[in-house]
């Protein structure tokens, strides 16, 4: 935000003018090999490479994505994320690229509430138009209502950032993000059905390491 003038404000309110939009929900399981070197482990996030007795549900090929049931959190997996990509055009013809990402990460497998909840939520927004970049991030603890998800109706939130819909599916839906420097309010519909990626949602993510994911897109 430092490269923006303090009083400059971007506000986007767009209805049915999404050029391209993709949403993915992913739960990823990572197995670290005992022989991995310190350099190799250093390339993986500190949260994912924790060496402890914590055991999360593995992503296995005999499981599959089932919609609309999987429009929800999957706390048995260590982490998952949702991505919202859009390209919009304002009334002057200026094009803006938008990415909003939302992550849930568990530090261990405990099912506890309040401040003992092991989940961490992170979201970031990036907007660019070729000459400017606007960006902001939010981080929240789980278990205290600061961030979370419901699916009847569908809603992802962290602080005052919301992706919500009237029904149990993400679309048609609304993404509402506001910061001190910029804000956007996007109403979105889809032009086709949801797509389950890979083999019924299962995708191998690394040729050598035991890394796989479940994912779907719109």
Which residues make up each language-model segment?
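Targeting-peptide/extracellular-domain and disordered-appendage signature
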Residues: 2-218
């Amino acid at each position: 935000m430092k490269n923006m003038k303090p009083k400059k404000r971007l506000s986007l309110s767009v209805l049915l003018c999404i050029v391209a939009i993709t949403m993915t929900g992913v739960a990823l399981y990572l197995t670290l090999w005992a022989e991995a070197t310190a350099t190799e482990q250093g390339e993986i996030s500190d949260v994912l490479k924790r060496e402890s007795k914590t055991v999360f549900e593995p992503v296995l090929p005999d499981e599959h994505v089932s919609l609309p049931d999987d429009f929800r959190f999957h706390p048995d997996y260590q982490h998952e994320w949702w991505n919202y990509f859009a390209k919009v055009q304002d009334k002057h013809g200026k094009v803006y690229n938008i990415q909003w990402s939302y992550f849930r990460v568990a530090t261990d497998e405990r099912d506890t509430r309040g401040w003992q909840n092991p989940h961490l939520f992170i979201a970031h927004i990036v907007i660019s138009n070729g000459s400017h970049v606007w960006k902001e991030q939010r981080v929240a603890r789980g278990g205290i209502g600061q961030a979370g998800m419901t699916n009847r109706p569908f809603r992802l939130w962290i602080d005052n950032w919301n992706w919500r819909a009237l029904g149990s599916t993400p679309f048609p839906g609304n993404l509402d993000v506001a910061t001190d420097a910029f804000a956007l309010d996007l109403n979105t519909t889809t032009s086709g059905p949801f797509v389950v990626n890979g083999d019924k949602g299962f995708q191998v993510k690394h040729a050598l390491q035991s890394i796989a994911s479940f994912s779907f897109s719109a």
